Swiss-Prot record:
Disulphide-bridged cysteine pairs: none
Gene: rpl33
Family label: Belongs to the bacterial ribosomal protein bL33 family.
The protein's name: Large ribosomal subunit protein bL33c
Keyword Ribosomal protein: yes
One Pfam short name: Ribosomal_L33
Subcellular location: Plastid, Chloroplast
Native species: Cryptomeria japonica
GO cellular component assignments: chloroplast; ribonucleoprotein complex; ribosome
A molecular function GO annotation: structural constituent of ribosome
Keyword Plastid applies: yes
Stored NCBIfam families: PRK00504.1 (NF001764), PRK00595.1 (NF001860), rpmG_bact (TIGR01023)
UniProt keyword annotations, A-Z: Chloroplast, Plastid, Ribonucleoprotein, Ribosomal protein
Length: 66
């Protein structure tokens, strides 16, 4: 049987360049993706390169707090 409870958690990834541009009011929105990660294998914050429809390019999306 499996040990422990929730090892996999649902996280939200947010575009880092859109959040920086939103302060300057250049971006029309902020791109967000949801995914799941294993807490034991990746205890640090996750960063993935994903497509941002607001920037029209692939940018780094970082994990944010809920």
């Amino acid at each position: 049987m499996a040990k422990g409870g929730n090892v996999r958690v649902t996280i939200t990834l947010e575009c880092t360049s859109c959040t920086q541009d939103s302060v300057n009011k250049k971006s029309p929105g902020i791109s967000r993706y949801t995914t799941r990660k294993n807490r034991r294998n990746t205890p640090l914050r996750l960063e993935l390169k994903k497509f941002c429809p607001y920037c029209y390019k692939h940018t780094i999306h970082g994990e944010i707090k809920k």
